[in-house]
């Protein structure tokens, strides 16, 4: 009776939604694509139905899917971990399934998970945010490589790109930076694709075959119904579940593709606040930053002076000042086919560096009284270079280039990516 009630409620809810996710389509098919399969699910709290039931729980309770385990990405399967961490492997108390920690591990470790679970199929269901350095699309890539190498089939239950799928923006990852977990292959900083489309690109461009020593992969995309490329997430009428602790709203996701570049600087990118990536600041920043940004008149954005006190991350417990970015998507601009977050981010970096840099502009910790670049972890590679996929943005700013000139410098490779991208688009 309980299962029948859940399915009846789900059917009624789906009728009210403009978009059905791949998970919804899978459930509506009575899991026909999974018949006879031993399924290892890669998911987290975003893998939900419109009724906010976790897909793994729904499949488990249905009794119609042979689940053999779960893999959890950054932040964990049940979403209990902050940025830069995963859960240790454990047994889920609700389902009794082994949950493997799949954050920041290579494909060899994922291969062991597949073998240990006895799976013959990996089912991927994560809500991405449309930005290259968000780690979920590289969890997708690595798990596809592992599936190919172990002869497991791979299925993606597709979900919307929450910041629209209209176009791609920003620099394309340089081949010399493909070892990073925030960039395995040369795609644009804001890619404008769904997870299913990216999976198709990974296979179609030969990247999975190359990374798995020539192994082929049987890939199935369970497509959405009703999604259009111009839709922001709120247009879908689906519930927004935080993909990660610092991604509370769709507006956060829209700005993330530009503002997260401040992670590689001595300024706070707003982590530890209720408005991460909208709020940027430092103890030594002031209202002049807002004044400079207003002079630049960056399309579709507005700015106001704001002070805040981060509860975690940079400047924890210290009051900092800076600005809050607002989007006005009604404004006309030269990026009318989407929101060019990387260009917004470069404008913010340009003004912050010009106003607040003093003396040396490099260092290992955000402790000095000026703007400087931070190294990535324990390496001597700048974090900004890892995030943008090359030294292009940093070196452009250091050489005195304007934001427009920097955007022009990444455009040739971006145009090539846009042409490749067209081959893999599944929706209009």
Per-range role (PLM):
Residues 226-316:
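Glycine-rich, aromatic-lined ligand/substrate-binding cores of catalytic
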Residues 1-17:
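Fungal secretory targeting signals
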Residues 79-83, 155-178:
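Glycine-rich, charge-decorated loop segments at or immediately adjacent to ligand/cofactor-binding or catalytic sites
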Residues 282-407:
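Conserved functional hotspot residues or short segments at active or partner-binding sites
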Residues 66-75, 157:
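Short internal beta-strands
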Residues 178-256:
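Conserved anion/nucleotide-ligand pocket segment
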Residues 128-140:
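Glycine/threonine-rich flexible loop motifs
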